[in-house]
């Protein structure tokens, strides 16, 4: 519809395959350097002319004579000058596909190569996660990891939560109490304040206190993060809340972002709380922080709030993003399955 550049850009996460299509797709060396496969789809000039006439007459209300004049005056000469050289340069084209969709052999070759490339990239990503795990395995926890002090109250709540015979209603009640404490620790760790003076009920007396310096917000990592949302609303009733759905591909172990709803001005917020009750390998946490960074949120304004986390997962997260803060209640085995959300949500 629009043959012009637009100021707005869209960030795409977790795609398996991105197709860049256009007559100048292989023209710029900076673009071709980022491509895994470069395909030139070849078609007969007469076929291209007939398609163009049909499109312009049917959809744009033009006449046939004007289409033919434009073809010979501008389109065809510029094709031979700018587009066809992309076909001739070996460095710019991996495969030339004649006859378009009718060429079943070429399509099969392309799909086979795509599968091989995806498998190779998946292996590289898994190796990188393992490398991060080995680097972080023996490292001490970062100072930005805040472990909630285990008072008698918290130890008692943990005892109830860890009991498999507890009723779901009681589990929700006590987990919500603990969620309030976790969110309070998160606000203490990440929010910025400014001096503020109020007049007290006593005439002539003032109280010099603090006021939030900006708007806080939270991102709930679905589906487990919804377990902490009740605690969030009790601490910050009017807090703006976004959503992310990140799931781990069980075949490859890679996190995949399926959905996100984030405030457009989140980069200006005082503090952003990321809520997820459990962290194991840290893959979903890494991706969620990456998404916030892509939306302009500085690392030092991100606080990851979780009930339990594996040490290696924490160290992976802090190795990649050392300036964020993490609030955690319990440190557990790295591969503990996600049972909290199942117990809380009842499914």
Language-model segment annotations:
Residues 13, 54-57, 76-146:
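NTP-dependent small-molecule kinase module
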Residues 64-67, 73-77, 302, 310-315:
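Catalytic phosphate-donor-binding core of small-molecule kinases
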Residues 5-58:
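ATP-dependent NMP and nucleoside kinases share a basic, alpha-helical "lid"
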Residues 25-26, 43-49, 54, 102-105, ...:
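Conserved nucleotide-binding/hydrolysis micro-motifs of P-loop NTPases
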Residues 1-17, 62-73:
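ATP-dependent small-molecule kinase phosphotransfer cores
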Residues 116-347:
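PRPP-associated nucleotide enzymes
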Residues 1-4, 18-23, 73-77, 196-202, ...:
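Short gly/ser/thr-rich secondary-structure transition/capping motifs
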Residues 16-17, 35-36, 94, 216, ...:
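Conserved acidic residues
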